[in-house]
């Protein structure tokens, strides 16, 4: 069993070899928008899982996921041969291709966040012209300011409290 660091290095090398082969050597038109996003190799170095995503030909066109999966399955033997020649390991790992759903999930999250921002903006527009129901301060007791005379006499009573230190001048 190989150490995990070697498995990570091999996974990165396999990812580079397969991506290069898909881009430059394999002439299947269904692989035109395929990008290898990640790869993982088991610790015994016998199995490699390659994650891929497919881009459409334009922004409006939906990617051909089924066509890309079929093309990768068809090219699996050629790709494994290239991996064996490029890595130099004793046993060439078997390749498995899995569609990467992270970009789709990220796009979905961006849509949800945009929808939440729009709802917040709508709520802010509604709040602009809104007024509070009832009085401005329902707990305000009217007339307290008038009893104190508004000159701070109430505050002066509370300043001269006895602290129990025999009436020092510092109080």
UniProtKB/Swiss-Prot annotation:
- Any idea which UniProt keywords this protein has? Cytoplasm, Ribosome biogenesis
GO CC, one annotated term: cytosol
Which residue ranges have biased composition labelled Basic and acidic residues?
Answer: 126-138
PANTHER family per UniProt: RIBOSOME-BINDING FACTOR A, CHLOROPLASTIC-RELATED
Family as reported in the entry's similarity comment: Belongs to the RbfA family.
Q: Where in the cell is it found?
A: Cytoplasm
Known role: One of several proteins that assist in the late maturation steps of the functional core of the 30S ribosomal subunit. Associates with free 30S ribosomal subunits (but not with 30S subunits that are part of 70S ribosomes or polysomes). Required for efficient processing of 16S rRNA. May interact with the 5'-terminal helix region of 16S rRNA.
Origin organism is Mycobacterium sp. (strain KMS)
Q: What HAMAP family does the database record attribute to this sequence?
A: RbfA
**Is the keyword Cell wall biogenesis/degradation in the record?**
no
Which superkingdom does the taxonomy of this entry point to? Answer: Bacteria
One GO biological-process annotation of the entry reads: maturation of SSU-rRNA
The name on file for this protein is: Ribosome-binding factor A
Region of interest: Disordered: 126-171
Description of how the protein assembles with itself and partners: Monomer. Binds 30S ribosomal subunits, but not 50S ribosomal subunits or 70S ribosomes.
Per its record, what are the GO molecular function terms?
ribosomal small subunit binding
